[in-house]
Amino acid sequence: VNLFKSASEIAKKTTFVVRGIRSYTKSMSIFVKATSAKEPRTREARNIAYMYAAILIVFVLTQLFNFDEFLALLESFWLPGGVPVAYLLGSIIVVSEVLALPFLLRMKVSPLMRIVSMILGWLVSLIWLKLALWLTLTVNAVSNMGFLGTTIRLTPGWWTVLFSVALGILAAWASWGLWPIRRRK
């Protein structure tokens, strides 16, 4: 009995052929096979994606510059759930901003990673919108919104809500222009 089989031997035995299509192999390629991003629908959509990526890069660099102070800032927002939620949210924000970049910059990644990256781009704008609404509608005496961490103070107000909506529009426009799911013909 040969205990060490090659990957091609294993693939031959685990590939299901349905209507002439290699189902298992085709469906599993979404996880591991890096592919190039398809061309954007318009030049403007590509430029919007680059602009949103530049904004996220500035955000994440300034937030990571003083990450411990960024977490303390989120803690001062008095979010429901207290300190653990603030720390978790801070980590989710930074990780989402970083992982949204492969989709926006059209990097060569697997199709699944491209979809996850696109969704994280939406999540970033949604989190910032919720935080902006929370700080604007509650009576928290906070002097910094946190877009740029604690490096540059940006006072919360309705402008932060509008800016967060603008981030959502950029994410939606980039998603429309760089839509990663190909149609079957």
Question: Could you describe each region identified by the protein language model?
Answer:
Residues 1-65, 69, 91, 95, ...:
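Extended, low-polarity transmembrane helix blocks
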Residues 65-84:
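Membrane-interface interhelical connector segments
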Residues 75-76, 85, 116, 144:
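Residue-level detector of alpha-helical recognition elements and their boundaries
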Residues 80-96:
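Interfacial helix-start motif at the membrane-water boundary
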